[in-house]
Structures are given as structure tokens and as C-alpha cells.
Amino acid sequence: GYLSFLRQLKQLEGVRQVTLTTNGLLLDARTMDELKDIGIDGINFSIDTLDSKKYAAICGQDTLDTVLKNLLYGVSVGLNIKINTVVGPLFTQSDLESLIDFCGNLPVSLRFIELMPLGSNKRENRIEEVQSYFASHYNIEEITERLGNGPAHYIRIKNMKCVIGFIEALHHKFCHECNRVRLSSTGSLKLCLFHKNSIALKPYIGNEIKLEEVMRDAIYMKPEQHHFEDEQSGTVMNQIGG
């Protein structure tokens, strides 16, 4: 299963960090203990709201209580936990306040992510609304040092354990720092979330030398930047693998 896969990844020479992005539903205490034993470097929980009805509408099932229980157990055993919240059209101030209340006294990162114009998503930067809320309601401090390997920029709030991060792929490009590629659920290597071009890797499974060669060549073709601002992709994130 995936736990065995993660353990093997951690043991590979040259692999410096392995993190997991998940909805958290199946990460019960036993699984969290095994992830701790594997040495997982971080777990990102995708949680867009703490309203159980809204959560069920987004995810298709009412599992929020289980997800939060799993998250809190992960925190209790010392795992590096981040919460990723996409600021979509249904995101409200009530959602924001609930997330702050939940995370405030936890040693976690709460990151607000700009909705990318994929599928039917519209171009609107609601991250600015979130940033304005923090600026007007809290005593905040910009964190100048880099936290982790990702593109988020962070702030601290006085008297809170959590740190707050913002990721704005469209309105504050970070393409010049991006060193990521994505393997889709269909076995294709995407060099950029937006670009339509991808490289099929399935034909090379079983030939490790050729597979490595194709992947190395592909990485050198990574686009210099995305063009979300010019046109909209019809692809949705769950088709890509995120």
C-alpha cells in the first residue's frame, strides 16, 4: 500500500523530504503512528471549511469530525501538520474565524490558497480579503525567513501558536521559484499545472534507465511560467491529481 511506498521513498538515496497531502479521512491513530515511524516530513490536510454541512457538500460525505480527530492526533504525536484552505466563492468570514479559532493554539501552519482558474473557477483574488481581515483584527508580524520549500509567505499573530500562510499562484506569481512536476493519476508527468502538455510515462515502466532518461529530459522542458492570466483551462484539479 501507500505506506510501504512512502517508507521506500524515505529510504531512497538523494530524497531529502517526503510529505503527504490528504483529506485526512483514513489517517487514524495507527496510521499516524506508522507515518511517524516512517519519518514523514509533513502532512498537509486539505480543509476548506469547518462547517460540517458545507464540508459535506464540498467533499461528498460528512466526515469532518473524523478528519479533525485524525489531525489532532497527528499534532499530539509531533508530526509537522499544515492545513490548506482554498479561498473559493463560498468561503465566508465565518469560515475564516472558525479556522483561526481551531488552529490558534495548535503548532500548525494554516495556509490560504488562491483559487486557480481551472475548470469553471473564476478569476478573483479573495486572498486579499483574508489578508485585510488579519491586518485589521490582529497584531501581525511578517515572517521574512523562508519556511519550508513551498511558495507560501507567512505571518505570525501575537499570542497564537499557529502561523498563517498565503499562496497566490495567479496574482503573485512564484514561477521563478517553482521546481515541481506532478505525476497524474493516469501516469502522465505534468510540468506545470496549467500547461496542457504532459509526458506519458506508462510506456517506460519496466525500463528504469529509459524512464529516468525521459523524466530528466522532460524536466528541462519545464515552462518558464504559467499563463493563467491569459486563458482558462478546462481541466479540474482532481483530474490532475491535486
Summary of predicted features, one role per range:
Residues 1-113:
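Radical SAM/AdoMet-radical enzyme domain recognition
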Residues 101, 105, 115-242:
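Auxiliary Fe-S-binding modules of radical SAM enzymes
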